[in-house]
């Protein structure tokens, strides 16, 4: 029976490359001369450092630009609040989201059931497995989900016959 998984996961290798490119651009830009602006990564947590709020916004813009060039959807980023760290310096923690959340998984299952397409959807941890008898039905479900779920980037993998 054909099936596929609906997942939401960023390519962490591309995220790391974008961070390295961002740090390189920040170190060479004239408006960051003599400042301690940088982006650090620990697992799925990015920390943005800057001298003030304005430069933090500039660092964020550089990072978003580099992520977009490397085809990483910026909807994966979850911004924390801006924290003061000694003097005028500020930092912001950005988390890279992974997996389909429980609410989104329920929404996907409801969308699939309401579509009246002859497929079954089940929640499997941080993914949603969609199973059907025809490959065409599965492809129409993929098209429907791409159209209806816009707040979170979705990937479709493990497409099996």
UniProtKB/Swiss-Prot annotation:
Enumerate the UniProt keywords alphabetically: Nucleotide-binding
Q: Which Pfam families match?
A: DUF520
For this protein, the record's InterPro entries field holds: DUF520 (IPR007551), UPF0234_N (IPR035570), YajQ-like_sf (IPR036183)
SUPFAM superfamilies on file: YajQ-like
Key word Nucleotide-binding present: yes
* Stored CDD domains: YajQ_like
Q: What does this protein do?
A: Nucleotide-binding protein.
Example of a GO MF term: nucleotide binding
Q: Which PANTHER family match?
A: UPF0234 PROTEIN YAJQ
Q: Record's NCBIfam families?
A: PRK05412.1
What is the name listed in the Swiss-Prot or TrEMBL entry for this protein? Nucleotide-binding protein BamMC406_2474
Q: Which domain of life is it from?
A: Bacteria
UniProt lists the family membership as follows: Belongs to the YajQ family.
Cite the HAMAP family for this sequence.
YajQ
* Cellular-component GO terms for this entry: cytosol
């Amino acid at each position: 029976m054909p099936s596929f998984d609906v997942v939401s996961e960023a390519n962490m290798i591309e995220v790391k490359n974008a961070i390295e490119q961002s740090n390189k651009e920040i170190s060479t830009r004239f408006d960051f001369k003599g400042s301690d602006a940088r982006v650090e990564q620990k697992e799925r947590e990015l920390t943005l450092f800057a001298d003030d709020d304005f430069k933090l916004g500039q660092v964020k813009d550089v990072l978003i630009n580099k992520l977009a060039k490397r085809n990483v959807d910026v909807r994966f980023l979850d911004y924390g609040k801006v924290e003061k760290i000694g003097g005028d310096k500020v930092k912001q923690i950005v988390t890279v989201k992974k997996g389909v959340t429980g609410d989104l998984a329920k929404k996907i299952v409801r969308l699939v059931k309401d579509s009246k397409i002859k497929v079954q959807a089940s929640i499997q941890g941080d993914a949603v497995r969609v199973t059907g008898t025809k490959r065409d039905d599965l492809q129409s479900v993929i098209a429907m989900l791409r159209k209806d779920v816009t707040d979170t980037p979705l990937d479709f993998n493990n497409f099996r016959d």
